[in-house]
Amino acid sequence: MSMRPPDPGQASSRARARMVERLRAQGIADEKVLAAMMQIPRHAFVDEGLAFSAYDDTALPIGYQQTISQPLVVARMIEILRAGRELGRTLEVGAGCGYQAAVLSLVATEVFAVERIRPLLDRARENLRPLRLPNVRLKYADGNLGLPEAAPFDTIIVAAAAAGIPGSLKEQLAPGGRLMIPLGSADQRLVMTERHGNIFRESRFEAVRFVPLLTGTE
């Protein structure tokens, strides 16, 4: 009797379903965010040797001293930004392997994702191509500077930690817009800034661990 090999698509779907149920148990309640996490295949954004860990709640290395954020952090940041509003035109700083941009594409009108490391940007393009997401645009740029040619943005999400919020990013936030960034070095916290005219109001959330936000391009 011959044995049929397991269907990787079905295995991935089951693993994603378990991940989503874990996210729900961890407090993620935004059904649109959970649906996006269910739809995007996280294993397609990591090296083949790490695919078995793709749906664990952990950050994974993607090369160049960068990581793909743990699923809970991705879901939590987007859920906070979506509370009571739509994301609209969104800037992601630190595209990395492209996973978060893919998730954002399902909950935002447009996604502009910038990455300062050229080989990572190329990898993100390769990872995203099979998904055919028409509302995602990738750009090779220093994320500290934002993307002035596409500003203003209703939402800005930064996937790297900084000592303070870069002024360029605040300037590119639309009135009523929200910006999420990890702040701190050893002790980091998620901080959301909301723009009301020229006034920026900050709200602080849980502790996190991100790679540092660096300047320039590589």
Curated annotation (Swiss-Prot):
| InterPro entries for this protein | PCMT (IPR000682), SAM-dependent_MTases_sf (IPR029063)
Q: What GO biological process terms does the UniProt entry carry, in alphabetical order?
A: methylation; protein modification process; protein repair
Kindly state which reaction or reactions the protein catalyses. Answer: [protein]-L-isoaspartate + S-adenosyl-L-methionine = [protein]-L-isoaspartate alpha-methyl ester + S-adenosyl-L-homocysteine
Enzyme's top EC category: transferase
The record's keywords, sorted A to Z, are: Cytoplasm, Methyltransferase, S-adenosyl-L-methionine, Transferase
Where is this protein found? Cytoplasm
Q: Where is the active site?
A: S69
**What EC numbers are recorded for this enzyme?**
2.1.1.77
Disulfide pairs here are none
GO MF terms here are: protein-L-isoaspartate (D-aspartate) O-methyltransferase activity
Q: Which Pfam families match?
A: PCMT
One Gene Ontology cellular component = cytoplasm
Cross-referenced HAMAP family: PIMT (MF_00090)
Output the PANTHER family linked to this UniProt entry: PROTEIN-L-ISOASPARTATE O-METHYLTRANSFERASE, PROTEIN-L-ISOASPARTATE(D-ASPARTATE) O-METHYLTRANSFERASE
| Membership in a protein family | Belongs to the methyltransferase superfamily. L-isoaspartyl/D-aspartyl protein methyltransferase family.
Physiological role:
Catalyzes the methyl esterification of L-isoaspartyl residues in peptides and proteins that result from spontaneous decomposition of normal L-aspartyl and L-asparaginyl residues. It plays a role in the repair and/or degradation of damaged proteins.
> What protein name applies here?
Protein-L-isoaspartate O-methyltransferase
What is the species of this protein? Aromatoleum aromaticum (strain DSM 19018 / LMG 30748 / EbN1)
